[in-house]
Amino acid sequence: MARYRHNRSRSRSRHRRRRRGHRGGRYRRRRRRGRYGHRRHHRGHSRRRRKRRRSRH
Protein backbone atom coordinates (compact mmCIF):
# COMPACT_ATOMS: atom_id res chain seq x y z
CA MET A 1 0.00 0.00 0.00
CA ALA A 2 2.50 2.54 -1.10
CA ARG A 3 -0.19 5.00 -1.95
CA TYR A 4 -1.22 5.51 1.63
CA ARG A 5 2.24 5.67 3.12
CA HIS A 6 1.62 9.07 4.64
CA ASN A 7 -1.35 7.74 6.60
CA ARG A 8 0.72 5.30 8.56
CA SER A 9 0.03 6.87 11.93
CA ARG A 10 -3.70 6.37 11.60
CA SER A 11 -5.26 3.16 12.71
CA ARG A 12 -6.06 0.94 9.81
CA SER A 13 -9.67 0.30 10.65
CA ARG A 14 -10.42 3.97 10.60
CA HIS A 15 -8.90 4.58 7.22
CA ARG A 16 -11.50 4.16 4.57
CA ARG A 17 -10.36 3.30 1.12
CA ARG A 18 -11.51 5.48 -1.68
CA ARG A 19 -14.10 3.97 -3.88
CA ARG A 20 -12.99 3.65 -7.42
CA GLY A 21 -15.23 4.78 -10.21
CA HIS A 22 -17.23 7.14 -8.08
CA ARG A 23 -16.98 10.47 -9.74
CA GLY A 24 -18.20 13.77 -8.54
CA GLY A 25 -20.64 13.50 -5.73
CA ARG A 26 -21.46 16.36 -3.47
CA TYR A 27 -18.33 18.40 -3.62
CA ARG A 28 -17.40 18.16 -7.25
CA ARG A 29 -14.75 20.55 -8.40
CA ARG A 30 -15.75 22.93 -11.09
CA ARG A 31 -12.34 23.37 -12.61
CA ARG A 32 -11.56 21.17 -15.54
CA ARG A 33 -8.69 18.85 -15.12
CA GLY A 34 -5.55 19.20 -17.12
CA ARG A 35 -4.20 16.86 -19.72
CA TYR A 36 -3.61 13.93 -17.47
CA GLY A 37 -6.34 14.38 -14.89
CA HIS A 38 -5.44 13.84 -11.27
CA ARG A 39 -2.15 12.07 -11.88
CA ARG A 40 0.82 14.02 -10.65
CA HIS A 41 3.52 12.57 -12.81
CA HIS A 42 2.89 11.20 -16.21
CA ARG A 43 5.74 9.24 -17.61
CA GLY A 44 4.79 9.08 -21.17
CA HIS A 45 5.61 11.54 -23.79
CA SER A 46 8.18 13.92 -22.55
CA ARG A 47 9.78 15.80 -25.33
CA ARG A 48 12.75 16.95 -23.42
CA ARG A 49 14.80 13.92 -22.58
CA ARG A 50 14.64 12.01 -25.82
CA LYS A 51 17.83 11.47 -27.74
CA ARG A 52 17.44 11.66 -31.46
CA ARG A 53 18.07 8.36 -33.07
CA ARG A 54 20.21 8.38 -36.13
CA SER A 55 18.27 7.01 -39.00
CA ARG A 56 20.05 4.38 -41.02
CA HIS A 57 19.99 4.89 -44.71
UniProtKB/Swiss-Prot annotation:
<dbReference type="GO" id="GO:0003677">
    <property type="term" value="F:DNA binding"/>
</dbReference>
<keyword id="KW-0221">Differentiation</keyword>
<protein>
    <recommendedName>
        <fullName>Sperm protamine P1-type</fullName>
    </recommendedName>
</protein>
<feature type="region of interest" description="Disordered">
    <location>
        <begin position="1"/>
        <end position="57"/>
    </location>
</feature>
<comment type="function">
    <text>Protamines substitute for histones in the chromatin of sperm during the haploid phase of spermatogenesis. They compact sperm DNA into a highly condensed, stable and inactive complex.</text>
</comment>
<dbReference type="GO" id="GO:0000786">
    <property type="term" value="C:nucleosome"/>
</dbReference>
<keyword id="KW-0158">Chromosome</keyword>
<keyword id="KW-0744">Spermatogenesis</keyword>
<dbReference type="InterPro" id="IPR000221">
    <property type="entry name" value="Protamine_P1"/>
</dbReference>
<comment type="similarity">
    <text>Belongs to the protamine P1 family.</text>
</comment>
<keyword id="KW-0539">Nucleus</keyword>
<dbReference type="GO" id="GO:0035092">
    <property type="term" value="P:sperm DNA condensation"/>
</dbReference>
<keyword id="KW-0238">DNA-binding</keyword>
<keyword id="KW-0217">Developmental protein</keyword>
<keyword id="KW-0226">DNA condensation</keyword>
<keyword id="KW-0544">Nucleosome core</keyword>
<dbReference type="GO" id="GO:0030261">
    <property type="term" value="P:chromosome condensation"/>
</dbReference>
<dbReference type="GO" id="GO:0005634">
    <property type="term" value="C:nucleus"/>
</dbReference>
